[in-house]
């Protein structure tokens, strides 16, 4: 085993199951957890709480650099703790998402958050969940996993999730939305969605979560 803090990155498209896999890996290994998809929402929420102008890079950069946030895997949920307060529910609000879009458009803020994300690497290790963790944020990570699944399977999983919440959704619409997002993510100019060259590509289309976790653990153990 390595004596420093190992980093395990898990990248992949929307709906592939990264969040669930990362939570289970963090729990099984006792590692720290980084949910990079939530980091801009967390910063936006911190700015709102502190009355910081969402268009001011000068004010947002120090806030991003010193962002006091923890991600805790609890059962099937990731609890997000901002400055000691559970803000998981607030993060899901539409206004938080809109504010996150504003701060994410500022280059210096993105750079500050990149450094802040790297600071999550600490003993005993880190599970980093995102889209460019293995290619941009932690290019030197010891273990890189790219979790994929067919667009049809991801749409089907999403439909089941929404139906369990009592929502009436159409499969074709969900599939179209996923395909459009895939296209945007894979063809964007900055940090396009792609597996790192040294990543294990796991296709979870016909696998259950236990099988995915087992393969991931085997790969992690072979690398550390």
From Swiss-Prot:
Its EC number is 2.7.4.25. One of its GO terms (molecular function) is CMP kinase activity. Keywords: ATP-binding, Cytoplasm, Kinase, Nucleotide-binding, Transferase. CDD domains: CMPK (cd02020). It is an enzyme of class 2 (transferase). Its main location: cytoplasm. The keyword Kinase applies. InterPro entries: Cytidylate_kin (IPR003136), Cytidylate_kinase_dom (IPR011994), P-loop_NTPase (IPR027417). GO terms for biological process: nucleobase-containing small molecule interconversion; pyrimidine nucleotide metabolic process. It is found in: Cytoplasm. It catalyses: CMP + ATP = CDP + ADP; dCMP + ATP = dCDP + ADP. One of its GO terms (cellular component) is cytosol. Transmembrane segments: none annotated. NCBIfam families: cmk. This is Cytidylate kinase.
